[in-house]
């Protein structure tokens, strides 16, 4: 199978997923092993986003681009991260490893390793093993 045929297949499959589930994941996003989509409806991942290994994305979450200001760019998400329902991560921010982002959180700042982030405006709480029992199917 040629590269062009493979790209056509990927685009057709992505189009079907977008229509059926509202799932919009850019083909230019870099995604590590073990991505888990919990209730995969209305999930958006912008182009050029970097997602590490063992990341859980839940219903309604958005990982998007900021087009202006100090945070212009896309997020980089580390390993073993859980992004809760209806959470939003925007701009050129780094989300560390072992981070749990609670439902309905809005993140537009860097988050260190081993943290739980919750609220809008979001607040960071340091916690060892933050994603224990929250990240599914480690690879």
Language-model segment annotations:
Residues 1-5, 9:
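Single conserved hydrophobic/aromatic residue that forms the stacking wall/gate
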Residues 10-15, 37-38:
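Short juxtamembrane and helix-loop transition motifs at transmembrane-helix boundaries
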Residues 15-23:
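Metal-dependent phosphoesterase signature
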Residues 137-139:
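Alpha-helical subdomain
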Residues 21, 27, 32-33, 38-47, ...:
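Left-handed beta-helix
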Residues 113-135:
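Conserved beta-strand-loop-alpha-helix hinge in the C-terminal portion
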């Amino acid at each position: 199978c040629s590269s062009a045929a493979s790209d056509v297949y990927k685009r057709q499959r992505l189009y079907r997923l977008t229509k059926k589930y509202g799932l919009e994941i850019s083909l230019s996003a870099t995604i590590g092993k073990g991505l888990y989509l919990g209730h995969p409806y209305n999930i958006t991942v912008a182009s050029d986003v970097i997602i590490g290994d063992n990341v859980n994305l839940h219903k309604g979450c958005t990982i998007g681009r900021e087009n202006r200001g100090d945070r212009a760019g896309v997020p980089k998400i580390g390993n073993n991260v859980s992004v809760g329902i209806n959470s939003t991560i925007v701009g050129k921010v780094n989300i560390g490893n072992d981070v749990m982002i609670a439902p309905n959180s809005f993140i537009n700042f860097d988050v260190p390793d081993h943290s739980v982030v919750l609220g809008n405006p979001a607040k960071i709480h340091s916690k060892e093993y933050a994603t224990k029992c929250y990240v599914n199917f480690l690879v």
